[in-house]
Amino acid sequence: MVNSLDMNVIKYPIITDKATRLLANNQYSFIVSPKSDKPTIKAAIEYLFNVKVVKINTAHLPKKKKRIGQYLGWKAHYKKAIVTLSEGDTINLFAEEN
């Protein structure tokens, strides 16, 4: 069973050109909590979306310098997870309007 901490594992899906190309291979990209591990991510995805996860690839992406005018700041580091689902399972990321 998934506890309340697992609900904070998945932050939001990634919607980029590469992520939309991966949808053809039944792979979905998410920004996840930096301290989460693969079994926790798998349990959260299976609980939230009611699908079967086959494989998870994760990557820690570093912080980057960002400049806005004369001000220099940092874009925070984050963790990305690419989740491969079993055949026949899908996640509806885009809400369909009637």
Swiss-Prot record:
PROSITE patterns: RIBOSOMAL_L23 (PS00050). GO terms for cellular component: chloroplast; ribonucleoprotein complex; ribosome. One of its GO terms (biological process) is translation. Pfam families: Ribosomal_L23. It comes from the Eukaryota. It is found in: Plastid, Chloroplast. SUPFAM superfamilies: Ribosomal proteins S24e, L23 and L15e. Keywords: Chloroplast, Plastid, Ribonucleoprotein, Ribosomal protein, RNA-binding, rRNA-binding. GO terms for molecular function: rRNA binding; structural constituent of ribosome. Binds to 23S rRNA. HAMAP family: Ribosomal_uL23_B. Belongs to the universal ribosomal protein uL23 family. This is Large ribosomal subunit protein uL23c. The gene is rpl23.
